[in-house]
Amino acid sequence: FSKNVKSISSYCPEKTIISTGLSKWCGAGGWRLGYFIIPDELNNIKNMINVLASETFSAVSAPIQYAAIKAYENDHSNYITKSVNILSAVGKYVFSNLKSNKVLINEPHGGFYLMPEFLNNKFKTSSEMCKDILNNTGVALLPGSDFGFNPDKMLARLSFTDFDGQEFMNNIDETKKIDENLINKFAPKVVEGVNKLKNWSENL
C-alpha cells in the first residue's frame, strides 16, 4: 500500500519470472486469465511451461478475453489508485478491530488477505476451528493447513473483499480519506464479519 515496494526483478531481472493475471491485478475474482513474463535467459523453462500449458489448459472463455483487451489497452491508473486506497483502509480496519490478546495478526501492506492466528486450546486443527467459526458466525475462512502450515497451528486465511467495490469507488475520489464511517457504509458485511469473529474469539 505504501507504493514503495521494489520487485526482486529490479535486482535480478535475468532470473526473475513474473506471473500475474486479471483476477489479482484487476481485482476481478474468477476472471482467470494469467500470463508469465520470462526473461530470455530462462528460455529453457519457458519452453517447458509451453509444453505443460498446451497439455493442461483449454482456451480462455470469450468474455474474459474481451475483458482482458479492455484491461490491457487502457490507462487504469485512477482505478488502481482508488482500489489501493480502499483495500488499504479496509485492511487496516480489519487489522485494528480484530487484533487482541486472543488474535495475533499482522498489519497488511498490500493485497486483500490476512492470516490471523486464533490463540486457543479448544481445537486440534485449524480445519476444525474454521468449521466451528462457519457454523457459529457464518464467516467463511480457509484453514492455515490449506496453505502448508501445520494443522495444529490455529491460522486462517481471511479475505476482506466482501463489499461492492464499484459502489465504494463511485463514492470516493483519489484525495478523499477513507474513514470508519465510509467503511461502515460501503463495506457493512466486512464490519459485521469482524465483529462476529471478535465475539467468537473472546468467548473461546
Model-derived segments and spans:
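Conserved core segment of the aminotransferase class I/II
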Residues: 9-85, 95-98, 176-180, 194-195
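Conserved glycine-rich beta-strand-loop-beta hairpin in the small C-terminal domain of fold type I
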Residues: 69, 85-95, 105-118, 152-154
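Conserved PLP phosphate-binding loop immediately N-terminal to the Schiff-base lysine helix
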Residues: 1-7
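Short, conserved charged micro-motifs
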Residues: 122-128, 166-169
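PLP-dependent enzyme catalytic core of the Aspartate aminotransferase-like
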Residues: 132-141, 147-204
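Short, solvent-exposed loop/turn elements at beta->coil junctions and helix N-caps
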Residues: 22-23, 102-103, 144-148
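Short, conserved active-site loop motifs that form the nucleotide-linked donor/cofactor pocket
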Residues: 16, 103, 139
